[in-house]
């Protein structure tokens, strides 16, 4: 570390990497410095003291050599003014001796023998080190055996002097100018040593970063080269560690096109000059172990591009970041102790597609604006558990600079957003949800990344994470860049990232965003704006291979998790196993069902008969994939209105239609997802700036019962759903569903049976007309003695008209809908009924 300059200005640490350094000496100060040193000669007493402080365990010849060196230095200083050096202020974090006046520092320096001058740093090495383009700084800097002893070379801009200190010696190095200090000591081997670096007003004691062997192993480099490092976050980024017995932090970054990489941060006051990284062979990885640097330090990589320009970049594998709009990475090590052992042990007991699975979708920053991860942990788990949802799905948690992107333009793929707290704080939230019996899904965005010039875009001066072909790099819809899935290191970066969230944060599943944009080379592109694959087709074969590898790796390493695809096309085999040439996802969002069903209920009841097929068509393909039925954030923003506001009619009819719709949705084959705020019929569409309108549930609000009734319905839907295996056990098996009537077009009625694995049925009936239908006859199996109404969305407690079937309904031996028996029901207006065997 070096002391802080007079002004610690990090305002320009982004972009091109330019930075402000400590103030230079003025001409007057230079003259004063020269005056202090000019004409001073070592007295005999000083010489004797210096000789005594030299290498005390050497031979008499060695002592004489040290004495002569001190005398020569004193004579030289008598005639040559000392070179002026830019000054720096005292470091808050420096391990420093007591600050002393500059005059005393100079005097103290005269009492320390100066090492004989070693061969100076070669001009080429000197230029490359100062320009930040040296691939092997450790081969020049540090201590190296040479003919005649051990050469010490140190780069410390702004230092007044540098002294090598071991158990046996204390010797000042020669000032070669421009921040270089060198010396040749008559030693047979490189000793354990430290550096005393004198700046104006302080002496700083430190380890020499350039005396350490690489802190990254050959196996790590091999796996990175192969694109197979499944724990990439343990090899790249900032890793606090003890290396060769010394605590510090290893910094590593993949930048194969860089001419040089240096490290800037709070520990060197954003001056990277003295902190060049070394290139580790042909891997493209650069590494530097910095002793004394620990958790909480801010840092970035200063990269010299192929054209010689510089750019200051955040760490792509940073595990913690500053809160936006700041962009620095932060050295981090987790100390969290998990308490969700029971959840983790039971997580993989039953396949997700054969389990109850209802999801509450949440945007954490706006669910309760202003709350941190730990504060959310006090409220969110209890709320979700009370409503009976099995999982929450979090909109992207990974760090993103623009809050208005909702997290879908990620810059920090390995760091939870710092807006709400630290990575360990986020673990605390996940832990709390697990202990409440709620699983945690997370939106994951491997489709694209933003163009911010401090992040991934042209990271080392050339396309690196993005594709080299401009037709494949730029995403036309979002102005972002698409990943180069064909590059093994990029694919590894993403696959390891998926594993990282599941293993390190105990995430139970990943919902992969914008899969369709990854699969098709011509996605949102006109003719001439895209380039075909090697076979002339429009399929992105590299993306297919990446998704298959990601899914296979996650399922192999983290049993019990689920991956979910947001895929809006008819791509075949999205949820088919990779060994059967599928993409390997566990579930897929059923975008077709969502669009069709919402389209149906938005029509006036009198017109719904012309759109009856929109509610039945989904069963034509319901078993082609394993589906989730999503009413997500995308459907309640950008002028689309909230769910209840989509419904026609007056306020009562709107709420009744939403209740009927949710009842139909929860009974339909597939898993359920509902975005926050829709569970209590929020009228306004969602905004990330203020979140749900919780005031609607304030008892002092006159219409509070209407909103509370909707929330009570959602709670009961989840409760009955979880206890009725017929609604989830055969979600992916055609034998688990049968239409009773799917063609009651004039009545706006739909009725179907769901079957559990043991054959136990549940009858679901929806009436999307605003009239009561008495004695409505429906065909049923003849082996059920009676049916009992287990849920009615028109119940009074939900805000309905309370038209019910209060008594068990017995079948009559009158065939209907191709079945030998039938029952007569009273169908409430705009409602859904669930009936089970009494």
Swiss-Prot record:
What GO biological process term is on the record, naming one? glycogen biosynthetic process
Enumerate the CDD domains for this protein.
Answer: AmyAc_Glg_BE, E_set_GBE_prok_N
- Please verify whether the record's keywords include Glycosyltransferase: yes
Q: Name one GO cellular component term.
A: cytosol
* Catalytic-site annotation from UniProt: 513 (nucleophile), 566 (proton donor)
Known catalytic reactions: Transfers a segment of a (1->4)-alpha-D-glucan chain to a primary hydroxy group in a similar glucan chain
EC number(s) on file: 2.4.1.18
Which portions of the chain have biased composition (kind: Basic and acidic residues)? Answer: 1-11
Q: What keywords are assigned to this protein?
A: Carbohydrate metabolism, Glycogen biosynthesis, Glycogen metabolism, Glycosyltransferase, Transferase
Q: Where is the composition biased (Low complexity)?
A: 29-57
Check the record and name the HAMAP family matching this protein.
GlgB (MF_00685)
Family membership, please give it: Belongs to the glycosyl hydrolase 13 family. GlgB subfamily.
Its subunit composition reads: Monomer.
Know the name of this protein?
1,4-alpha-glucan branching enzyme GlgB 1
